[in-house]
Amino acid sequence: MDYFTLFGFPARYDVDGSLLAARFQDLQRQFHPDRFVTAPERDRLLAMQQATTINDAYQTLKHPLKRAEYLLSLHGFDINNEQQTLRDTAFLIEQMTLREELEVLEHRADADEALMSFSDKVAKMVQVRSAQMINELDCQAWPQAADSVRKLRFLDRLQQQTEQLEERLLGM
């Protein structure tokens, strides 16, 4: 059973976050290992496995990028284990330029303001790419959606690096 079915959703990108959380709590209550303390060992093990699957499914479906990766995996695009790399040279050059820009920010006199501006720019890029990915997933354009997810992974890492720099600057 796939994660969408487990939570009673159709296998598509759009998931109601509130409903997901409510169904997660219901499933947790239903399969919590404490409810199976007096059950035979086989039943306890099955409950533990089911609880683990429920937790994994929830973590996957609640995170937009993980949800997209999972949906693609259901359609034959295993992005997490693939050896394919991005072939979009312009995007890769843009990423290298952005990373260089981020490295230089730390040493600027106006690092706080520059970092805020940089962070806003990256957030806008993520927003645009996410909208494109959602449209591709809705249209079942799986190869294009997979490419967008690969690009969003780069941007996600860049956002994480930006947050780490912000924490370092605040700690100074």
UniProtKB/Swiss-Prot annotation:
The UniProt keyword set, sorted, is: Chaperone
Domain called J: residue spans: 2-74
Q: Which PROSITE patterns match?
A: DNAJ_2 (PS50076)
Q: Which CDD domains match?
A: DnaJ
- InterPro entries, alphabetically? DnaJ_domain (IPR001623), HscB (IPR004640), HscB_C_sf (IPR036386), HscB_oligo_C (IPR009073), J_dom_sf (IPR036869)
MF term (GO), any? ATPase activator activity
Is Metal-binding a UniProt keyword of this protein? no
**Which GO biological-process labels does this protein carry?**
[2Fe-2S] cluster assembly; protein complex oligomerization; protein folding
- Spell out the Pfam families in the cross-references: HSCB_C
Q: Which GO terms describe its cellular component?
A: iron-sulfur cluster transfer complex
Q: Which family does it belong to?
A: Belongs to the HscB family.
Checking PANTHER family in the record gives: IRON-SULFUR CLUSTER CO-CHAPERONE PROTEIN HSCB
What subunit structure does UniProt give? Interacts with HscA and stimulates its ATPase activity. Interacts with IscU.
Q: What does this protein do?
A: Co-chaperone involved in the maturation of iron-sulfur cluster-containing proteins. Seems to help targeting proteins to be folded toward HscA.
Name listed for the protein in its UniProt record: Co-chaperone protein HscB
